[in-house]
Amino acid sequence: MRKGAEFEELAVKYLEGIGYKVIHRNYHCRVGEIDIIALDGGTVVFVEVKGGKTTDFGDPAERVDRKKMERLLRCIEHYLHKYPLEDYRLDAIVIRNGEIEHIKGVELY
C-alpha cells in the first residue's frame, strides 16, 4: 500500500460519514496530486490529507511546506481549467494517533 493511502482511506470514510460525496481520489496533474476532491452540497472541496500514527516525529500538519502548497495550488488551477467552477474551497484533514481534525477553508499563501 502506498504511503499515505491508509490515512486517505480514513479521510474518505470520515467525509462520506458527514455527507460529502467523493468524486475523485488522487487526482494527478503533471506537477502533483490532489488527495481527495469531494462535494459538500454544491461546493467542490479539494482536500489535502496528512497523517501520522504518532507525533513522535512532529505534527503531521507541519509536513505541508511552501513547495507542497505551490504544487497543490497548481493542481487545483489545472482542475479548475478543466472543470470551471465558481464555488470551491480547500480543506485539510489531519490524522494524529487515529484522531481526525477537519480544517475547512484553508488559505493558500
Per-region residue spans from a language model:
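Acidic-basic catalytic patches of nuclease active cores, encompassing PD-(D/E)XK
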Residues: 1-25
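Acidic active-site catalytic centers that drive phospho-/nucleotidyl reactions
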Residues: 8, 33-35, 48-50, 68, ...
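Active-site metal-binding core of divalent-cation-utilizing nuclease and nuclease-like domains
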Residues: 21-44, 108
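Structural motif
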Residues: 31, 44-46, 87, 100
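Mg2+/Mn2+-dependent nuclease catalytic core
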Residues: 54-76, 82
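Domain-level recognition of nuclease-like catalytic cores that cleave nucleotide substrates
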Residues: 82-109
